[in-house]
Regions:
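Catalytic-site signature segments of enzymes, centered on catalytic residues
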Residues: 133-216, 242-256
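Catalytic loop of the DD-peptidase/beta-lactamase superfamily, centered on the K-T-G motif
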Residues: 19-54, 183-188, 192-196, 200, ...
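Active-site helix/loop module of the DD-peptidase/beta-lactamase fold
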Residues: 20-23, 74-78, 92-134, 157, ...
Length: 470
C-alpha cells in the first residue's frame, strides 16, 4: 500500500490563498500524487509574498527519502535561461552584439559556417545546429565531455541542419556554442561565470552543477513510472552532464530569487536589457520595462525535462504571480502547470488522466486480451500514441512477467498504429516465439526483416525458427 506523503510547508508570515483556490490546488496536487503523475515541489507567489509552498513524494523512491522545500531538482533546459542572462550581460557590457557572427568573435568551423551564424541565430534556435545528445560518442561516453571545449570538439564536426536564419530547430548544441563564447569573452569557465554573475549575487546557494560523482546533499533522483506502476531510477543510465544548454540543479525558492531579480531589481540586468531578454532577443520591439510589465497578456514560461525530470518556471507578469513546479517524475510539472494556472484564474481545466502507459497496462489486465483487441480504439480515444516505443515498452512489461498473451495483444495494436515500423513486428515475433507459435513468429520476423534488411536480430531468429521447422 502506497503511503501518501504531503509535507505542507506554509509559514505563518505567508498570506493565505482564497479558500476556494487553496482547496482546488490541494485536490489537484493530491490527485496527481496518488495517480503517480507527480512527485516534487510546487511554489506559488504573488508580487509580494510566497503564498503556497508544498512538497509531495520522495526525492529517492528507493530509500523513501522525502522531498523537502530545499531539495535540489534537475531543471533541464531552464538552464538555457541562465545562459541567455549571461549573454544579455555581455551585450549590456558592450562586449557582444546580437549581429556578431562566429567569425568575428569565436571561430569554430573551417567550412564557411562561421560567417553565417550570428549570436541571435544561436539564441533563437535558427543557426542550423542540432543536438549533441544525438552524437554517438557523447551518448556512449558523456563523462568525457564535461567541459565546454570538449563538447564543442564534437559539435563542430556535425553538419548544419539548414542554412542559418532560414528555419528553426530546437538545439542544445547552439547553447553550448554560446557557453564557449561566454568563456572566451570573460576568460573564465561557464560555471565560474554562472556563480559569479548570477548565483552568488542572488544568494542562490542551492543551485549549480552536480555530476554523478559529486557529493549529493539533499538532491533528488529522477524516476520514471513503469506501466505496471513500479518506479525506476534514471540515475545510473542517464548522462547527467550539466552544460550551458541545461542540466543544472536548483530549488523552487532559488528560482524565485531569480524571478524576483528579473522583475524587481537591476542586480543582473538593467531595464533595457531585461526587455531584450524577456522579448526573446527581438531588438525590433521598442518599449520600456514598465510598458512591458503593464501588458496584461505578458508572461514568460520556460520548461525543462529529461527522463525522470520535469520543471516549469511560469512568470505571469500580467496577472502578477509566479508558479514554479519541480518534479522528479516524468512530465510531472507540465501535467500540472496549465491546471494550476486555470485554478488561479478561475477557469475550467480538464481532469487529470492516468499516465498513458499505466492506463493501457491496467485496461489490458482488467478487460482481458480479447476485449482490448476488439475495443482498443474506444479505450485509447482520449490518449495520444505518439511513437511505437510506448506500446513496445508496455508489451515488454507483460512479457517480462510471463504474461505472453497480454504482450502479444499490445504488440499487435502497435503494428496497427505503426504499420511501417519494422521493430513493431520484431517484438511481436519475439512474443509469438516465446509462446511457442513458431509459424506466427516466423511470419512477423520475416516482415520485420523485409522492412529493415539491417535487422540482425530478425535474421538470426528466422534461421533458428526455420531450423526448428526442418
Amino acid at each position: 500500500m502506497k503511503t501518501l506523503l504531503l509535507l505542507f510547508f506554509i509559514f505563518t508570515q505567508f498570506p493565505i490563498l482564497p479558500q476556494k483556490h487553496l482547496e482546488e490546488l490541494n485536490k489537484l496536487l493530491n490527485d496527481a500524487y496518488k495517480m503517480d503523475l507527480f512527485s516534487g515541489v510546487v511554489l506559488f507567489a504573488d508580487k509580494d509574498n510566497v503564498q503556497f509552498l508544498k512538497t509531495y513524494g520522495y526525492s529517492d523512491w528507493e530509500s523513501q527519502t522525502t522531498n523537502l522545500t530545499d531539495t535540489k531538482f534537475n531543471i533541464g533546459s531552464i538552464g538555457k535561461l541562465f545562459t541567455q542572462i549571461l549573454i544579455a550581460q555581455l551585450i549590456q557590457e558592450e562586449k557582444l552584439n546580437l549581429t556578431d557572427n562566429l567569425k568575428q568573435i569565436y571561430p569554430l568551423y573551417n567550412n564557411g559556417y562561421d560567417e553565417k551564424i550570428t549570436i541571435k541565430h544561436l539564441l533563437t534556435f535558427s543557426a542550423g545546429l542540432g543536438d549533441y545528445f544525438m552524437i554517438e560518442d557523447f551518448e556512449m561516453h558523456p563523462d568525457d565531455y564535461r567541459s565546454t571545449e570538449a563538447l564543442l570538439s564534437i559539435i563542430k564536426k556535425q553538419p548544419l541542419l539548414f542554412e542559418p536564419g532560414t528555419s528553426t530547430e530546437y538545439s542544445n548544441s547552439s547553447y553550448v556554442v554560446l557557453g564557449g563564447i561566454i568563456e572566451k569573452l570573460t576568460g573564465k569557465t561557464y560555471l565560474e561565470n554562472l556563480k559569479e554573475r548570477i548565483l552568488n549575487p542572488l544568494t542562490m546557494n542551492n543551485s549549480g552543477f552536480i555530476y554523478k560523482d559529486s557529493k549529493r546533499i539533499n538532491t533528488a533522483k529522477g524516476f520514471i513510472v513503469n506501466p505496471d506502476g513500479t518506479k525506476e531510477s534514471t540515475y545510473e543510465r542517464m548522462p547527467n552532464v550539466p552544460t550551458p544548454a541545461g542540466g543544472m540543479f536548483s530549488t523552487a525558492e532559488d528560482l524565485l530569487k531569480l524571478d524576483r531579480s528579473l522583475m524587481n531589481d537591476n542586480v543582473l540586468l538593467n531595464d533595457e536589457h531585461k526587455v531584450l531578454l524577456l522579448n526573446r532577443f527581438n531588438s525590433d520591439i521598442k518599449m520600456s520595462f514598465a510598458e512591458l510589465l503593464s501588458k496584461p497578456d505578458f508572461g514568460m514560461g520556460v520548461a525543462g525535462g529529461s527522463p525522470g525530470w520535469n520543471a516549469v518556471y511560469d512568470q505571469n507578469v500580467g496577472n502578477k504571480y509566479t508558479v514554479i513546479v519541480l518534479s522528479n517524475i516524468d512530465n510531472g510539472a507540465e501535467v500540472l502547470i496549465d491546471r494550476i494556472n486555470s485554478i488561479l484564474r478561475e477557469k475550467k481545466y480538464p481532469p487529470l488522466k492516468m499516465n498513458t502507459g499505466r492506463f493501457i497496462y491496467e485496461i489490458v489486465k482488467e478487460k482481458g486480451v480479447d476485449d482490448f483487441l476488439d475495443n482498443y480504439k474506444d479505450y485509447l480515444s482520449g490518449y495520444m500514441i505518439e511513437h511505437d516505443g510506448l506500446l513496445n515498452r508496455i508489451g515488454y512489461q507483460f512479457l517480462n512477467k510471463g504474461m505472453t498473451d497480454e504482450a502479444i495483444a499490445v504488440f499487435i495494436i502497435n503494428t496497427k498504429y505503426f504499420p511501417d515500423i519494422a521493430n513493431t513486428y520484431d517484438s511481436l515475433g519475439e512474443a509469438y516465439m516465446l509462446k511457442g507459435d513458431n509459424k506466427l513468429a516466423l511470419e512477423n520476423y520475416k516482415k520485420s526483416l523485409k522492412m529493415n534488411p539491417q535487422n540482425k536480430n530478425a535474421e538470426m531468429r528466422i534461421v533458428e525458427l526455420m531450423e526448428k521447422e526442418n
